[in-house]
Structure formats: structure tokens, C-alpha cells
């Protein structure tokens, strides 16, 4: 059932002329029915965890991987990574270095030398194997970015999307992330000198925050409920009716009953 056929069904039930088109129709009654249909779609979407609107998203923890091009045998070890963007005091995870493999899998606090070079605090690489090639550095950070940067932009509204609790897992570590934390619990963790033992998360300021800060480059997945309750005939999801050929992702029968109720309530 499309928007057009649903509205035609509604108009027959409420006793007004059925339209041949809805979108762009200038008849005041059809304009009102369309407005009521959009109201009904929004409210239905918020009332239930519809499986048709449930989606899964995966993302990679930490900042973008920065390519390492050189590492010195020195105290402290000096790392070359063009335009790394790091600041003194930042922590980075290093992986995939060839040659100087002793660096791999470890977390380092760094000192910025310049835009392309940083040193690894308290790391004497003088006796390490010689660096040959490759390597990635990732900034260790509690914030995994905005929700909108994690969830596909084409099916997202930060004010309406709902994350499904108890579905967030670190697939690399095969461990759950517990949450979302309350404000009190999260602030308590920030005040504590102890980290762990559980990985936890909180949403704040439209950011996804992890505690403790995860290792960079790991895959995390979770489910969420989209606020897009209809879609175009081509399958593009939407949060409002825009064309006669649009199709509901929620039962149009339920929507039609709701529109009829709204019409009668308004009269």
C-alpha cells in the first residue's frame, strides 16, 4: 500500500472525495489528511521498536590510522608520521610495524616534536630491531565521534534515533560494552583512579563515549531504531511522506486507522 492508496482508503472511510494524487494536492482537506498522516507516522515510530526500522551499524574505534614512515633507534624512540595531528600528552596505539616489531600492540604517551614527528615517552628503542617499513598509529580517545558520524547519514536524525540497549559489542575482543551509563555513574568513573574491568559507554552531547578508552582499530557493532518510518519507491528511507508512491515501513493499515482517528479528533 502506497501513500496514495492509504489516503484513498482513509478518505472513503471519513466521507470525503478520494484524490487521484496526494503530494502537491491543493485541496484543503487532502492537505490536512497528509499532515495527519505524517503526524501518525512520527508517533507510531516512537511508540514501538519496529523490526522493520531496526538496523545494525559497525565502526572502528579510535582516531583515523596515521601511517608511520620511519622510527629511530633512540631514547626516546622518534616516529615519523606526516601530518599526524597529535599533541604532547596524547596516547597512541601502534600496530603493523615491520622490522621494529617490539612497538606493536602497545600504547604510548607521546611528545610532539613537529607536525610530522613525535617521540614515544619512556621508550628506549636503542636495542630494538631496525625499522623496515609500515606501521599505523591511532589516537587513543574516549570519544568515538558523533552519533551522526557513526550511523549512516542517509538514515539518521540525531534527535530521534534510538540505540538498542545491550546490543553493543566489541567484535575484535568478543566482549560486550555495558551501558548506557547514567550521568552519575560516568562522572564517578572519571573521578576514579582505577579503570575497568568492564568496557562501558555513555551518550553525551551527541557523542559516543567509552570508558576506559579502547584500543584503536577495533570493530564495535550495535543495533539502533531508525526514525525513518517510510521510504520512496526506490527504497530510500525517509521520515516524512513526500510522494504518492512512498511506502510505509510500518503497517499502512495501522497508519490508516490512526489517521482516521486524528481526523475525527480534529473535527
Question: Which residues does each PLM region occupy?
Answer:
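Small/polar beta-strand repeat architecture
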Residues: 63-151, 216, 224
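Glycine-enriched, solvent-exposed interface loops adjoining structured elements
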Residues: 1-67, 136-267
Amino acid at each position: 500500500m502506497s501513500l496514495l492508496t492509504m489516503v484513498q482508503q482513509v478518505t472513503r472511510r471519513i466521507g470525503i472525495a478520494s484524490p487521484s494524487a496526494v503530494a502537491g494536492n491543493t485541496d484543503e482537506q487532502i492537505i490536512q489528511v497528509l499532515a495527519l498522516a505524517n503526524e501518525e507516522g512520527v508517533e507510531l515510530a516512537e511508540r514501538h521498536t519496529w523490526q522493520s526500522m531496526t538496523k545494525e551499524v559497525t565502526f572502528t574505534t579510535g582516531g583515523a590510522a596515521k601511517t608511520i614512515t620511519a622510527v629511530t633507534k633512540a631514547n626516546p624512540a622518534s616516529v615519523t608520521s606526516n601530518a599526524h595531528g597529535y599533541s604532547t600528552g596524547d596516547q597512541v596505539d601502534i600496530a603493523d610495524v615491520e622490522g621494529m616489531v617490539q612497538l606493536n600492540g602497545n600504547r604510548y604517551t607521546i611528545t610532539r616534536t613537529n607536525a610530522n614527528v613525535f617521540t614515544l615517552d619512556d621508550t628506549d628503542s636503542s636495542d630494538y630491531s631496525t625499522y623496515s617499513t609500515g606501521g599505523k598509529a591511532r589516537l587513543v580517545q574516549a570519544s568515538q565521534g558523533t552519533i551522526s558520524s557513526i550511523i549512516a547519514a542517509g538514515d539518521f536524525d540525531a534527535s530521534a534515533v534510538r540505540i538498542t540497549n545491550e546490543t553493543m559489542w566489541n567484535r575484535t575482543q568478543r566482549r560486550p560494552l555495558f551501558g548506557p551509563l547514567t550521568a552519575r555513574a560516568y562522572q564517578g568513573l572519571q573521578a576514579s583512579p582505577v579503570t575497568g574491568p568492564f568496557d562501558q559507554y555513555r551518550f553525551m552531547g551527541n557523542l559516543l563515549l567509552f570508558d576506559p578508552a579502547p584500543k584503536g582499530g577495533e570493530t564495535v557493532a550495535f543495533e539502533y531504531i531508525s526514525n525513518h518510518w517510510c521510504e520512496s519507491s526506490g527504497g530510500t528511507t525517509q521520515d516524512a511522506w513526500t510522494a504518492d508512491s512512498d511506502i510505509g515501513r510500518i503497517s499502512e493499515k495501522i497508519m490508516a486507522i490512526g489517521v482516521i482517528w486524528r481526523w475525527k479528533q480534529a473535527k
